[in-house]
Amino acid sequence: YSDDECRERYIEHFTARHDALEELRAFLPGIFAKTLLHAFYFMKPKDSEKLMDLLLQTSFEDSLPFFYPLRFVLASLGNPLLESVHLDASMFTYLSPKKMSAIGLPYDLGTFASFLNGFSQLSDFKTTGDYAGMCQVLTRVCRLLSEQIGLLNKEVTDRFGKNPNQLPFVWHIQAGRPQVYYNVAVSIIADVRKGVYKNQEFLPTPATLAEKYGVSLISIRRTIALLNSVGMTETINGCGTRISLYRKPLESLDLSSPGTRKSLIFYLMGLQLVTINVRTVAQESFNAITPERIEEIIRLYEQETQSRNYLYTHGQILKTVFYSHKNSEIRAIFSPLIHIMSWGIPLSYLGDSDMDAKGEELDLLISLLKSGDKEGFARQLEMNSWNILIRKRQKLMDAGLTDAETIRIPALEILNLASDSIHFNSH
């Protein structure tokens, strides 16, 4: 592209994303800071030294000044799913001097030097184990990021106007992108939850399923193989494939397929992402949950209490918390996690049952929801998610999924420290 063409593309990049950038900067500081705190906590000491080397090598001229340090820190969590959320958001803002100078906007190197200085301080705090001090620096760095996005947005809009064709932020899952058959499997699990397909009943023929979900017969066969491997369905020669949600030994989990292993690791990644962020989101969305929706959740919970099969209430509460949030970008980022959580349904029937534990946890959560205790509800939802992550991770490790060990359990003291020490005013 010529310089003029680049300039036009840069201008379009920002003017078409004004609304999304405002939404992103309204919530990113809290989510970023709390995620980075966990990432630093899990970072190995030798990686802290590597981070300092990376900071010294980071160039102001090439890209977002702290993009590479950010990616390095996030990698400590071992969760590409979570990493991709933050990296997409970072590149979405893309505050590079090249872009800004091309469209004639001032670029304050001092501001961006403070980002790198902040990461240097964070590395020092990691060495000394001062996570309270780390919270202060993370708050300052992430607040500055939000302010700079806002200033840039205003300057661009004042100078070039607001593009009427606004584009939303789109989260591209960069690592471990699901295949078509994975998405169809999740859709079928969702249809089981909705009662479209009932337990012990046969699914429609593969040809009918292919037409319904708009995929090839090969994809449907792979979908059925995936669902069979996790115990969601079973195929009977000459009869077809039926939903088979009943108690099975853990050994019946078939981990021979890479697709199955990948799907289950994906599930644990989603659980970790939820555990780290759900208290923040729940605190902000609690007051927007309608009385009608609360009644629906209570009815579902009471039905599951009668059967002692707590399969759907936790997921419906998560869905409600995410969808009730006023920030459209929060909804865009967290809504896909509802589908990822679906894999917990067949896992509940494999090996030892955790229904009693889930029942006790939901008792507490529902009582807090009824009472209107926002802080207590958000804290308990985080705790429930933390417990589920521990149980499911251990179950998959016991089944032989060794990669499950790479998904780290967030430390309770860090979850609590993040909640107590990292706060931002809403825009």
Where are these regions (language model features)?
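Short linear motifs at protein or domain termini
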Residues: Y1-A26, L167-Q272, N425-H427
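Ordered, small/hydrophobic-rich secondary-structure cores
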Residues: E8-Q121, S342
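Helix-turn-helix/homeodomain-like alpha-helical modules used for DNA recognition
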Residues: T15-E61, G129-R143, K262-Y301, G376-W386
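Short, structured motif recognition centered on aromatic/hydrophobic residues
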Residues: L24-L36, F67-A75, L81-P97, I188, ...
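Short helix-adjacent coil turns
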Residues: F42-D47, Q57-L64, L77-P80, G110-Q136, ...
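Conserved amphipathic alpha-helical segments that form helical-bundle/coiled-coil interaction surfaces
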Residues: K46-P97, Q136-L145, T290-L347, Q380-N387
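C-terminal all-alpha effector/ligand-binding and dimerization domain
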Residues: A102-V170, Q174-A175, L347-H427
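Long compositionally biased, domain-poor regions of proteins
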Residues: S187-D191, G195-V196, A207, K212-G214, ...
